[in-house]
Amino acid sequence: EELAGFVASALPLIFSPNTKEISKPPLSIEISQAVSFIEDHYDSKISLTDIADYVGLSSSYLCRVFKEETGVNINTYINNLRMAKAVRLLEDKNYYIKEVAISVGFDDQLYFSRLFKKYYGVTPSQYRAAVK
């Protein structure tokens, strides 16, 4: 009876929408440095070698540990960041699509548009029109 009462009182807490997710452990120093490097340089060409040299790890080891700690590979992380920045810039009607692409590190507007559509299901122009 006591156990049933305990379970009944605990259920709302367990299924409460305010329950915090289990947090992931903090990133290692090297991966934190890699993330900072990417955030500081997302608007230019970033090579795996550049990041590995910056954090002092081999490229292959960096790739493995980065994925283990962040859950995504480095290229995906870079593209996720670039797409998030692009969305913000597209909401500002003062920039041409080409300028947005260049501002987030893409030299090729067509590739940028294809990747944007892959992420969001619409082209940058369609996205911009939808957020009027």
Predicted regions and their residues:
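…primarily DNA-binding HTH/wHTH and HhH modules…
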Residues: 114-132
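Short hydrophobic/aromatic patch on the recognition helix
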Residues: 61-62, 66, 111-112, 116
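Terminal helix-turn-helix DNA-binding modules in bacterial transcription factors
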Residues: 35-36, 40, 45-49, 57, ...
